[in-house]
Amino acid sequence: MPYTLDEHDQVCVLTIKRRFLGSIERDALQQTVDALIADGRTRLVIDLTKTDFMDSTCVGLLVQGAERLRAADGDARLAGMQTRVKNLFVMARLLGRMFDDYPTVEAALQSFAAPVASRQA
């Protein structure tokens, strides 16, 4: 798998390690999110510091995962996006509407301690 999963103070951190192609990694990512929800672990930081490429299918998978986490009273936040990856989320108008973006994993983890304003689609 091109990612690892760790837990920090009841928040899971999904670190994507390289190029992430949703068409290839779709099933594994969906199974991971499903397992987290089944275990009641619904707060997720997606660490993109090592991700230099992501296709639009992967962006769609992350949106679906975030929606499923929110339906289970959780949330997903993005951390450490490189410019190339961030541009995908900006062009799709997902930052601030679907995802909150943090410069570091630590900042994203700390954000779970503070309330977040509700998003409007």
Can you describe what each PLM-predicted range is?
Residues 12-14, 32-44, 108, 112-115:
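A short, hydrophobic secondary-structure junction motif
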Residues 20-99:
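Amphipathic alpha-helical interaction surfaces in cytosolic regulatory modules
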Residues 2-31:
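STAS-typified acidic loop motif
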